[in-house]
Regions:
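A short glycine/serine-rich beta->alpha loop
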Residues: 53-54, 70-77, 116-124, 154-162, ...
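Structural signature of FAD isoalloxazine-binding scaffolds in flavoprotein oxidoreductases
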Residues: 76-96, 215
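Beta-strand segments within the central parallel beta-sheet cores of soluble alpha/beta enzyme folds
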Residues: 100-102, 147-154, 183-195, 334-339, ...
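Glycine- and acidic-rich phosphate- and metal-coordinating loops
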Residues: 135-157
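Phosphate-handling active-site elements
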Residues: 140-148, 175-192, 397-410
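Fold-level recognition of mixed alpha/beta catalytic cores in primary-metabolism enzymes, strongest
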Residues: 160-248, 430
Length: 430
């Protein structure tokens, strides 16, 4: 194992280009940027935790949700892809029983005493709660872990809908899994991370984000048994036909402060399920739901009913998207993407926040996408939890420059990313 200074020198000399190319592609400009990024992270680790320490470097990807918007937490299907935007973590094991994490862009150094397992007052919604919760998740499955020091640098924008939280969680879990040889599978690590986000961080998320970051590629997941989801991995290079590009636009509206809005979607769906004596909509017969519509409107209210309709339709649509990918029928897939986007407006109602109708960045981005892509073979939809954050668009090459320019004229330079998908999940790179 090399020291941080030794690794920095090796990276800048190109000794680790093959490992970097496996994650980010072999484009020389991309490799040059990643060399500089990794070298800077190693330098920052030394600044905060001292020189001469033997370190390892980890990467955990963000994800683009391809289908299954707000279906995973109801025992439904999910479809997502890992992307090359990722979190990089430089880590060294320690022996004092503390975890110390410094993240680029945040002033605070997280210091977690592993002897204190319970959620701490005032810690929820902060990264320290995720670290503490992940540690407890390892212990809950009988794994012995200890402390480490880490510096992280993330290209997954916070609150952007690319799941920066899952990338951070999987980065932390990967460090423990490697440094302490716990031997857990990617799916098991994802479950621990979801537990931390639900129980310690206080966000009632599903499991799709963590699974995608853990496994990589394109994954189709069946959450009928959320404890043991059934996972199919599709090769990422099978998504886009020649000349088609996946763009994600950051509308510069973070949903990091919208936990209550996300929670309401899950709560309302489960309120409808409870009328049938079930905890999740995935356990409710769809025909019975439609037969009970008059009673459900009275008991649960119309928004809850509409969100339940969204669940049933989006779930069927996600299965159809998977089948279209297997059959390499991109036009069918694209049509389903547009249907999903329409459902977010009409049924799930998570494109904008009703408490702040003045700000509707997602709506503007979707309207602009429709104006440019309507009539083409492209498609567009909101992605992620909603209310703010990002949209995605499948853009034909002949329209890419026009689309990119128009989007950035509205949302600013650097707001539109042309994403590359990634086969690898969270991994030790060096």
């Amino acid at each position: 194992m090399a020291t941080s200074a030794q690794l920095r020198k090796q990276i800048l000399q190109g000794s680790w280009d093959a490992a970097l190319a496996a994650l980010y592609g072999a484009d020389p400009a991309v490799l040059q940027r990643q060399r500089g990024r990794y070298a800077a992270a190693l330098e920052q680790f030394e600044l905060y935790f001292g020189p001469g320490r033997q370190v390892q470097v980890y990467s955990a990807p963000g994800r683009a949700e391809l289908g299954g918007n707000h279906t995973d937490h109801q025992g439904g299907y999910g479809l997502a892809a890992a992307v090359t935007l990722d979190l990089v973590a430089v880590a060294a094991r320690n022996t004092d029983g503390y975890v110390r994490v410094k993240s680029r862009g945040f002033n605070k150094l997280d210091v977690i005493d592993l002897a204190t397992a319970e959620p701490q007052a005032g810690e929820s919604t902060h990264s320290a709660s995720l670290i503490r919760g992940i540690a407890e998740g390892f212990r809950a499955v009988g794994k012995q872990i200890g402390g480490f020091d880490a510096y992280t640098a993330s290209d997954v924008l916070r609150g952007s809908g690319l799941s920066s939280s899952a990338a951070f969680e999987m980065g932390m879990a990967s460090i423990w899994n490697e440094e302490y040889s716990t031997g857990l599978t990617p799916a098991e690590l994802a479950g621990i991370c979801q537990y931390a986000e639900n129980t310690y961080f206080g966000k009632p998320s599903g499991l799709l984000d963590q699974l995608t970051s853990a496994v990589g590629g394109i994954i189709f997941a069946d959450f009928a048994d959320p404890r043991i989801p059934k996972i199919e991995k599709l090769h990422a290079d099978g998504l886009l036909p020649e000349g088609m590009f996946l763009c994600v636009t950051d509308t510069r509206g973070s949903h990091s402060e919208l936990t209550s809005e996300f929670a309401a979607i899950r709560q309302e769906m489960e309120q409808v399920a409870a009328c049938f004596g079930k905890p999740l909509l995935g356990q409710v017969e769809e025909n019975a739901f439609w037969m009970a519509l008059p009673v459900l409107r009275s008991c649960c209210g119309d928004r809850a009913v509409l969100r339940a309709i969204h669940y049933f339709e989006e779930n069927a649509r996600t299965l159809a998207q998977r089948d279209a990918l297997y059959a390499k029928q991109f036009p069918v897939f694209a049509g389903l993407v547009k249907q999903s986007g329409q459902a977010s407006f009409a049924l799930c109602q998570n494109v904008y926040c009703t408490a702040d109708v003045r700000h509707q960045g997602l709506s503007i981005a979707l309207a602009l996408s429709q104006r440019i892509l309507q009539g083409s073979e492209g498609a567009w939809r909101m992605q992620g939890g909603g209310f703010a954050g990002t949209i995605q668009a499948y853009v034909p090459g002949r329209l890419l420059e026009r689309y990119h320019t128009a989007i950035e004229q509205v949302f600013g330079q650097g707001s539109c990313y042309v994403l590359r998908l990634r086969e690898q999940g969270a991994v030790r790179v060096i």
